[in-house]
């Protein structure tokens, strides 16, 4: 896409929101409580603040304010307000490709924010536990928050990811013509690295005329030992392993497809 010469500030709002899910099997009530305590500490407010602060560094944003809170009995939230940085538009990379991991990308932001909320969850029946992190990066300026996507998914390793990206509003060029998007995008997947794409099965649901893009990701490889909390698969009977595998896989598919699936 040809670079636009704008009249005034770029007024487009670009919002990236995604949920990541971590699934676990905990056999006893004590193990379920232990998993919730473990994941709650792993993604506490301080660590989430570090991740979001690095995200600001990646997109070149100035941090104005940080609000963070750990909740009882579990959960945490962090919201960071960020401001614009003066930047030469010639330095902005508008091409459709994966963003960096720790490297810095210049951004031009205004009235923007980055926030995350966590939701640990378990049920006494079935032994299944889930952890969801809900993240939103919203910017107003010349760069898409998709540049932070690669880093965030690498930091928050997950079994399932659902991603939404939307461009809202319009900006005007020097001739007064309105532009409702200022960069090319065919798929959110184009902003992911090849190693990440190789790990997940992915599907897109895009509404191009509305500048709405959606991608769902489900981890390809399933190894039972990675889903057990304080229990080794070899300590279980073959029947138990099969039943737990079926329960975990059903749980993951239900979350991925967003609907309950009847037992076969």
UniProtKB/Swiss-Prot annotation:
Q: What does it catalyze?
A: S-adenosyl-L-methionine + H(+) = S-adenosyl 3-(methylsulfanyl)propylamine + CO2
Manner of cofactor binding, per the entry note = Binds 1 pyruvoyl group covalently per subunit.
Biological processes annotated in GO: spermidine biosynthetic process
Indicate yes or no for the key word Chloroplast: no
Pathway info: Amine and polyamine biosynthesis; S-adenosylmethioninamine biosynthesis; S-adenosylmethioninamine from S-adenosyl-L-methionine: step 1/1
Keyword annotations from UniProtKB, A to Z: Autocatalytic cleavage, Decarboxylase, Lyase, Polyamine biosynthesis, Pyruvate, S-adenosyl-L-methionine, Schiff base, Spermidine biosynthesis, Zymogen
GO molecular function term, any single one: adenosylmethionine decarboxylase activity
What are its E.C. numbers? Answer: 4.1.1.50
The PTM entry states: Is synthesized initially as an inactive proenzyme. Formation of the active enzyme involves a self-maturation process in which the active site pyruvoyl group is generated from an internal serine residue via an autocatalytic post-translational modification. Two non-identical subunits are generated from the proenzyme in this reaction, and the pyruvate is formed at the N-terminus of the alpha chain, which is derived from the carboxyl end of the proenzyme.
Q: Does the keyword Lyase apply?
A: yes
List site positions: Cleavage (non-hydrolytic). 111-112
Query: Which residues catalyse the reaction?
Result: 112, 117, 140
**Protein task:** Catalyzes the decarboxylation of S-adenosylmethionine to S-adenosylmethioninamine (dcAdoMet), the propylamine donor required for the synthesis of the polyamines spermine and spermidine from the diamine putrescine.
Family the UniProt entry places it in: Belongs to the prokaryotic AdoMetDC family. Type 2 subfamily.
**Could you tell me what this protein is called?**
S-adenosylmethionine decarboxylase proenzyme
Q: Which organism is it from?
A: Salmonella heidelberg (strain SL476)
Lineage per the UniProt record: Bacteria, Pseudomonadati, Pseudomonadota, Gammaproteobacteria, Enterobacterales
